[in-house]
Every structure is written in C-alpha cells, then in structure tokens.
Amino acid sequence: MKDKKPEHIDTKCHMIKPLNFALIGAAGYIAPRHIKAIADTGNNLLVAYDKFDSVGRLDSSFPDCSFYTENEQFDRFCSKQMRTDNPLQWVSICTPNYTHDAFIRYGLRLGCDVICEKPLVLNPYNIDNLIELEKETGHKAYTILQLRLHDKIRALKEKVANGPEGKVYDVDLTYITSRGNWYYASWKGDVHKSGGIATNIGVHFYDMLQWIFGPVKKNIVHVMSVDRVAGYLELDRARVRYFLSINAECLPANAVQGEKRTYRTLSIDGEEFEFSAGFTELHTESYKQILAGNGFRISEARPCIETVSEIRHAEPIGLVGEYHPLAKLPLAKHPFGWDERR
C-alpha cells in the first residue's frame, strides 16, 4: 500500500520546500551514497553525527551541515531544531549493524521518519518492537533494499512470474568480496555486531532471491567459518546453492588473473545472470521511492532478516546433500588465531 507523502508544502507560496535530514554515521562506508541521495532529491542535510571525524565528504554537497562527534551534542541540536519552524523530518542511519534498531528508535521518538541502511536489524524480534514503536509515534521507518530497484533484477522477477507455472529453478549464487585483516579487527568481524558473513555481505541477496522466487521452505548451512558461509535454500520457485566469502583465496582463477578483488555471479538453470553494473544510482532511486511514499517498510525486511538469523544460529552439516562447489575449499584460520565462529 502506498504511504501518504510527507507534508512539506509551503502553503504561503505553494512551493515544495526541501526536506530536512539528519544523518547518523556520516563517516561510514555507505554514508556517501546517502549524502548523494539527499542532495540528488533536492533536500537538505542539516546535521550529521559520527564518533569519527573523517567527514570531509560533506563539503561537496552540504558544507553548511552541522556536525558532531558527541551523541549528546547531536541530540541537543536535534531536539532544539524540532522546536523551531524549520524542524527535521527525516533521520538517515548508516551506522554499524548492531546499532541500527537503537538509532531507528531514536529517530522515531524524535518525531521523524527514518531511512536505515541494510540490514535493518540483526534479529526478527527487533522488527516486532519497531513496528510497535511506529504505531506509538505515528512515524515510519524504511529500509534500503536497492536490488529490488535494479532494472535487470526487476526484469528477472517479471520473467519468473510470467514463466511456466510451478517451475522450480536451479540457482547458484557466488559472492566473494575480498577483505584484509582490518575486517577482523573491526566491528564487521564480530558476529555479535555485524551478524556474521551472511548478514553483513549477503542480506541483500537473500532478500532479492525471496523477492523473485518466493519464501524459504528449507534453510540448510553446509559450511560456516570466520570468512565464509555456504548453504542451500529451498524457495517456493528455486533451489539455491550459495557461497559467500571475504577471503581472496576463494577467488576463481579468472578473477585473480583479471586482478579483481570482488567476484559476483548468479547462475539460473546453468545460465549466468549478469547484474554487476547499474548499482551507482540505486540509493538515489531508493530515496526517490521512499519520499514518494513507495518505500520498503519494516515488515518487508522480515523475510531476509529471518533467513540470516536462522543461518547465524544454524549448526553446519558439512559436505552433505546439495552443496555449492566452492564449499569444498580448504578452511582458513582466523588471522589473529581466534577460534570463535564469526
């Protein structure tokens, strides 16, 4: 159902006023895409917050944006702004995964609508709590599920929907995005903060697969270690073998020869589906859809959050049944000697 558009009409001059945004996590990896999306949609970034001060990226679009490295100062600014005739309307969140639900709650209680980077939350029960808070505050939270806006992926969904009724596709998903030792020292290397490999680098793929092929009927994990996860998903219209890794040693020979550090491929019934291009403007398109009342609400993220949560808590069964060919690769040790499964 289409949401009501935000009220930002200047009744005196009948012009659409720019919406005011606050950005939490301005120094993060994904923040530039949100900053660009706010600018590209003609809106205003009033204030930004991050514990780290490497935020020169603000200069290109919002040099007058207020910036704070202390949460208390940021909150003071936001609270004062809400009592003016030029209040904040939106809070965008680009922080580490484990903080998402807390900052979503902050934005809703502040009196704003919220846009949160994926994964929306780490656990399904967080979704229930946020839906209740939406009802209490009268404000809404949206998530970024940008693969649903990719032209080729939308075309694939339409092709499957219009294809033979009841056909079940055989799908192989491989995604290797090489990361160095820094990854393990950061919050991303801590399963309690990132959610693990499946959540941190794979949640958008699990959303895409279910959006196209239907809900998960069976969820099996074959291999899960500090740098990879491999498993099998049986969906309503697909049998999916997947392999996700951050270890460059897992890259296939053709990627290594081409000096590529990232390898992404999706095979459907033995035919490769290419969708590596076309990602650059998807955050801007996501913002356009959200601001037009067509964004992806909290409940739409539930299937993929449930899937990655089940994977995180699963006990790997080993190389049994329908496993991805790369699942056979030798396991690597944690670079710091830690044996905790991440």
Task: Describe the residue ranges of each PLM region.
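Local beta-strand N-terminus motif with an aromatic residue
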Residues: L45, D64, P87-V91, E165-V168
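Rossmann-like dinucleotide-binding domain that binds NAD(P)(H)
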Residues: N181-L251, R302-E306
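N-terminal Rossmann-like dinucleotide-binding module
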Residues: K2-D64
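Beta-loop-alpha module in the N-terminal Rossmann-like domain of NAD(P)-dependent dehydrogenases
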Residues: S66-I131
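C-terminal substrate-binding/catalytic lobe of Rossmann-fold NAD(P)-dependent oxidoreductases
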Residues: V229-E281
